[in-house]
């Protein structure tokens, strides 16, 4: 049964990507992604809203009711009150994806109609608690852009192709499938766009297997957490792994994230809705996490998962006020201007609760470089905040082949020790990238859970040793011995084989000499 479902899922993904590739024409897929993802989202929220009303009326006894067939006036009067408070937005029947796609091919005002619909959906939340969660959601879905074509008819043709393409995808009955098929399709598209985009794609999507590992690590030994936070959330893939891995009652107060890039910020919010996370259970903000943190009032967080940009530039000590910032001041040094890695780490530590855990993907150089980075490492080690350092295989991420490292932070450690795990061999080779398999993830989590020495796999090291003997070097290779996989040679056996070979050679020489002597006599 599982194999059949997996085959069906792969076929659905193949069709979705074929449609996305076909409708973009000569436009670069990366530049076109917001239209495919945005229209898929539009279809989802339309079907979600229609199903919301249909289900309620059917349960009340009106089995013939269809929200999509109502007049806008009836819907406005009978269904809008209370809906925005519950769902966060409202869509009139005429604005539903189903009704728009019916005459999309003949609609000479399609691009303007869609722009007005998207604007109306956003405006429906004005004055309600969901206003900030909906505001600007469709900003990147510009139906007037020349990306779609140079003339209005060309724009309308491209938009009609997208609408009909998305409409042709069979997600099954919405009531039965709910959001699973939509959410899965959205994640698949994001992953493919990221993979094809290379380096730029890696900025907004963390591969699902790495996301799954981080989600597992932060929950080891925990039955529930208050909320989960990603300070550089991209498209929200890391946050959503927490939802996929754990039941709702385990994550009590929802999902929080911040993202500096506008497109990624909108993708993350759409991603939340597509995975059935209601507006009142997530809070995604836009802005520079280091210079304009948006969740100071919501901290602390029991779980933080993050894959911040590697060694990007920031203002650092160019802003003299930052050394007094509560997030950075405790270490006594700011991260270097050319490498903001430890600024993100200190930010996460500041937002972490006393019983929480953070798992952060890092560039490996930060664990051994000197200067300010060494000073910050010393602060983390001396205050016993480093729970584990885990080296990952290379080529796991889109756009970079470097072998990254996971830094695990906690504030409630019982021992002044740090666990180092060498997971560099835990992968399966695929066409373009290495991937973590389910068994790889289980093995890494098991090593972390057991928190002990395992030959060639993990080393539990006293913090005093890290400081006094290793000068606060946190590289895994410093502590976990590499297994010598060369064939071991038994000298005694080798000497015996050599002696036997020499004896054979001597015997053969004697035989040859005898033959030569006989030949000489024959002459």
Label every model-predicted segment.
Residues 22, 165, 169, 188, ...:
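Conserved, well-folded catalytic cores of nucleic-acid-processing
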Residues 36, 182, 225, 252, ...:
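A structure-centric signal for secondary-structure junctions around beta-strands
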Residues 1-213, 217-218, 280-289, 391-395, ...:
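Non-catalytic, mostly N-terminal accessory regions of nucleic-acid modification and defense proteins
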Residues 27, 43, 49, 189, ...:
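Conserved NTP-handling cores and scaffolds of large molecular machines
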Residues 2-3, 7, 298-523:
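A conserved structural/catalytic subdomain of Rossmann-like adenosyl-cofactor enzymes
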Residues 200-306, 311-313, 317-322, 327-332, ...:
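Conserved S-adenosyl-L-methionine
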Residues 114, 181, 228, 336-338:
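Glycine-rich, flexible loop segments associated with nucleotide phosphate handling
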């Amino acid at each position: 049964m599982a194999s059949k479902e997996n085959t069906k899922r792969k076929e659905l993904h193949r069709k979705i990507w074929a449609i996305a590739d076909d409708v973009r024409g000569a436009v670069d897929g990366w530049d076109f992604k917001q239209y495919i993802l945005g229209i898929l989202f539009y279809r989802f929220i339309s079907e979600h809203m229609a199903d919301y009303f249909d289900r309620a009326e059917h349960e009340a006894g009106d089995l013939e009711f269809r929200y999509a067939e109502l007049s806008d006036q009836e819907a406005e009067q009978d269904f809008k009150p209370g809906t925005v408070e519950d769902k966060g937005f409202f869509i009139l029947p005429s604005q539903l994806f189903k009704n728009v796609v019916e005459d999309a091919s003949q609609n000479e005002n399609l691009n303007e109609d869609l722009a007005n619909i998207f604007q109306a959906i956003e405006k429906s939340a004005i004055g309600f608690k969901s206003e900030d969660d909906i505001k600007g959601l469709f900003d990147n879905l510009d139906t007037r852009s020349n990306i779609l074509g140079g003339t209005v008819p060309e724009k309308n043709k491209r938009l009609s192709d997208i609408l009909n393409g998305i409409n042709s995808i069979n997600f099954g009955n919405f009531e039965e499938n709910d959001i699973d098929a939509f959410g899965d399709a959205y994640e698949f598209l994001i992953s493919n766009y990221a993979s094809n985009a290379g380096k730029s794609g890696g900025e907004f999507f963390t591969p699902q297997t790495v996301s799954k590992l981080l989600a597992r690590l932060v929950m080891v030994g925990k039955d529930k957490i208050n909320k989960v936070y990603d300070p550089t959330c991209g498209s929200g893939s890391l946050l959503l792994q927490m939802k996929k891995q754990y039941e709702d009652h385990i994550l009590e107060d929802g999902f929080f994230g911040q993202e500096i890039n506008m497109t990624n910020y909108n993708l993350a919010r759409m991603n939340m809705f597509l995975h059935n996370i209601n507006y009142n259970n997530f809070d995604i903000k836009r802005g520079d996490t280091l210079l304009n943190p948006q969740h100071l009032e919501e901290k602390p967080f029991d779980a933080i998962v993050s894959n911040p940009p590697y060694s990007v530039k920031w203002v650092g000590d160019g802003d003299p006020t930052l050394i007094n910032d509560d997030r950075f001041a405790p270490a006594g040094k700011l991260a270097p201007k050319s490498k903001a890695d430890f600024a993100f780490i200190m930010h996460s530590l500041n937002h972490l609760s006393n019983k929480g855990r953070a798992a952060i993907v890092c560039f490996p150089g930060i664990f051994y470089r000197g200067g300010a980075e060494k000073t910050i490492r010393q602060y983390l080690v001396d205050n016993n905040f480093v729970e584990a350092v885990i080296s990952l295989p290379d080529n796991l991420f889109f756009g970079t082949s470097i072998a990254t490292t996971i830094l695990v932070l906690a504030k409630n450690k019982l021992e002044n020790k740090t666990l180092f795990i060498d997971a560099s061999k835990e992968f399966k080779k695929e066409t373009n990238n290495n991937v973590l398999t389910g068994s790889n993830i289980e093995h890494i989590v098991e090593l972390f859970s057991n928190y002990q020495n395992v030959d060639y796999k993990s080393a539990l090291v006293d913090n005093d040793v890290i400081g006094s003997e290793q000068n606060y070097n946190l590289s895994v290779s410093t502590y976990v011995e590499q297994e010598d996989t060369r064939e071991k040679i038994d000298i005694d056996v080798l000497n015996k084989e050599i002696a036997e070979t020499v004896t054979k050679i001597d015997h053969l020489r004697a035989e040859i000499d005898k033959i030569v002597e006989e030949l000489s006599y024959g002459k």
